[in-house]
């Protein structure tokens, strides 16, 4: 299938449904990301293949025209039927994302649905095929700060120990035992034998040492967790000793995170190949798909699923007809699929940029924005899956905040706001776009000139765009299972907004407060300290918590063994299928 051809047809269809359509060569060059010379050459090639008739405009001001031999709907259905027969998923997803009428797909919607979700191949391999609604960012543990990517790392790797969310304690994993000195400065770990990496070598203490050393790099997301390490010694092949410069009872909790995935010391890290010890290993990764295969040599129970496929599909309303195991978009009516909702998954918030000069530096302006956004009204009037209104990082601590819109004009006057433009950053996620537009409209009612800057997840976490080009940002935070660790990471992680947008004066005071939190041994007192830190952040309007959203996943009723992963998704390594899956498919895919 020629994707450029259908990109052009969809673009022109939205201008005219006629078979003969006027156009500008510059427009086609733009959508094809090429020069006008190459766009003209491409049209001539299509004409040579009898796909269209190209009628260039002769003379200045005369518009060029294209004549197509058949309607776009007919061509789309022909290609779809061929792609379905060939299991050409990439082509099908491409067509589903085009800005063309959803009704065109109605006659073959069942066939399209059955290509996703549960499958069994000709040689009886069980496959789970799913969709993600954006391109993946980095899978390097040194940088990963996004929940979906952290979840994927937990499926292809293992940490030294794990955190049991139900029991609220650390449990053995690669390390079967450990001991710690009374002052929490000396840690000794005893490793399992016969833990194999994906390339066949047995893991030993030198690999753990290598991983910790790698994670101690200054630009690592985990640097703040490991900066107290004084020495790492391999006592023998399966025993490791770590000495800290100062006491840190949280040290072992740091080792549970996806960022502490144990890597082999003898392989240069490549996030597109990813060698570790996890229950799955990467078979293929590119912009279109990520394919995981079960690792037969896994040191615990081998996954029952043989393969998991994540296909990237960023746009397209027709995609709502497909089972979406890994997205918050609802899956439309199919009785075989059951929607699972989880309340209060993380928190959505605004974070103000205190590096940039301008009106957002004024506390009165930030307070005006606080009173402007009444999330209780949003949850009732505007948005699905909005969840509960937030006033704290934790859902269980949040109570409906008091908003006083009658104060806004006086606060704007106090801040000497003169209608100047304020850059409001948000991501490309559909719900974020809708919510940010709602906030922009609320602001306009009070004369606040908010200009939205829409950025990618990659830019939000791994670039200087938030700090250099926005006055405040709206983001969502999905924490790990360990509540206290999640809060520490939210405020310490160099790739998350607080560390990106707070100036050094705020960071210094915040660090002192977090250090006091970490050194407090009593959990109930730490809870009081967390409330105090959150109150300090919100009363100064450095942060404005918005809401704790719902998370929904559409799962086939035959999927069993569902267990929550620390990052809000279900653990693929524990999934199994109760009866015969939907249909037989080929052993491979395109």
Where in this protein do the model-derived segments appear?
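Aromatic- and charge-enriched surface segment that lines or borders ligand/interaction sites
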Residues: 17-21, 42, 145-147, 177-220
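Append "and occasionally in soluble cytosolic enzymes with long acidic Gly/Pro-rich linkers
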Residues: 361-441, 445
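Long beta-strand-rich cores associated with HINT superfamily self-processing modules
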Residues: 555-590
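Extracytoplasmic/peripheral linker and loop segments enriched in polar/acidic and small residues
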Residues: 101, 452, 490-555, 590
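Periplasmic binding protein-like
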Residues: 447-492
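N-terminal lobe/hinge region of extracytoplasmic solute-binding protein
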Residues: 131-180, 588
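Surface-exposed binding/hinge segments that line
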Residues: 65, 223-265, 281-284
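Ligand-site clamp/hinge motif
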Residues: 297-337, 344
């Amino acid at each position: 299938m020629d994707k450029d051809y259908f990109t052009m047809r969809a673009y022109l269809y939205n201008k005219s449904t006629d078979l003969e359509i006027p156009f500008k060569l510059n427009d086609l060059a733009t959508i094809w990301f090429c020069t006008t010379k190459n766009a003209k050459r491409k049209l001539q090639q299509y004409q040579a293949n009898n796909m269209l008739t190209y009628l260039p405009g002769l003379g200045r001001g005369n518009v060029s025209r294209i004549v197509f031999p058949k309607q776009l709907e007919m061509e789309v259905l022909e290609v779809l039927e061929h792609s379905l027969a060939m299991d050409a998923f990439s082509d099908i997803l491409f067509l589903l994302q085009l800005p063309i009428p959803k009704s065109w797909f109605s006659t073959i919607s069942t066939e399209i649905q059955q290509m996703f979700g549960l499958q069994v191949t000709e040689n009886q391999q069980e496959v789970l095929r799913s969709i993600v609604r954006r391109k993946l960012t980095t899978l390097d543990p040194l940088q990963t700060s996004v929940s979906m990517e952290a979840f994927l790392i937990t499926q292809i790797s293992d940490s030294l120990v794990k955190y049991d969310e139900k029991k609220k304690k650390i449990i053995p994993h690669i390390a079967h035992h450990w001991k710690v000195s009374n002052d929490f400065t000396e840690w000794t770990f005893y490793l399992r034998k016969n833990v194999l990496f994906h390339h066949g070598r047995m893991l030993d203490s030198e690999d753990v040492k290598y991983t910790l050393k790698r994670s101690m790099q200054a630009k690592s997301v985990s640097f703040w967790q490991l900066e107290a390490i004084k020495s790492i010694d391999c006592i023998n092949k399966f025993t490791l000793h770590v000495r800290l410069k100062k006491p840190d009872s949280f040290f072992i909790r740091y080792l549970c995170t996806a960022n502490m995935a144990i890597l082999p010391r003898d392989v240069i890290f490549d996030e597109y190949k990813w060698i570790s010890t996890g229950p799955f290993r990467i078979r293929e990764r590119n912009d279109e798909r990520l394919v995981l295969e079960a690792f037969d040599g896994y040191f615990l129970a081998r996954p029952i699923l043989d393969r998991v496929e994540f296909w990237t599909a960023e746009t397209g309303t027709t995609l709502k007809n497909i089972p979406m195991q890994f997205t918050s978009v609802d899956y439309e009516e199919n009785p075989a699929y059951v929607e699972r909702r989880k309340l209060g998954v993380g928190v959505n918030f605004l974070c103000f940029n205190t590096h940039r000069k301008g009106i957002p530096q004024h506390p009165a302006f930030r307070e005006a924005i606080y009173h402007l956004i009444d999330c209780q009204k949003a949850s009732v009037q505007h948005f699905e899956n909005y969840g509960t209104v937030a006033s704290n990082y934790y859902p269980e601590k949040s109570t409906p905040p008091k908003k006083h819109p009658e104060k806004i004009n006086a606060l704007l006057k106090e801040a000497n706001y003169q209608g100047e433009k304020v850059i409001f950053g948000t991501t490309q996620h559909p719900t974020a776009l809708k919510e940010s537009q709602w906030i922009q409209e609320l602001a306009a009612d009070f004369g606040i000139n908010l200009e939205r800057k829409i950025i990618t997840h990659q830019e939000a976490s791994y670039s200087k765009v938030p700090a250099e080009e926005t006055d405040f940002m709206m983001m969502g935070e999905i924490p790990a299972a360990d509540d206290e660790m999640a809060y520490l990471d939210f405020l310490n992680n160099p790739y998350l907004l607080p560390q990106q947008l707070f100036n050094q004066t705020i960071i210094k005071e915040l660090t002192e407060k977090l250090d006091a939190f970490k050194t407090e041994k009593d959990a109930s007192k730490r809870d009081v300290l967390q409330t105090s830190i959150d109150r300090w952040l919100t009363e100064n309007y450095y942060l404005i918590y918005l809401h704790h959203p719902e998370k929904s996943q559409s799962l086939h009723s035959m999927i069993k063994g569902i267990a929550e992963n620390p990052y809000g998704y279900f653990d693929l390594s524990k999934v199994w299928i109760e009866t015969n899956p939907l249909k037989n498919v080929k052993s491979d895919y395109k």
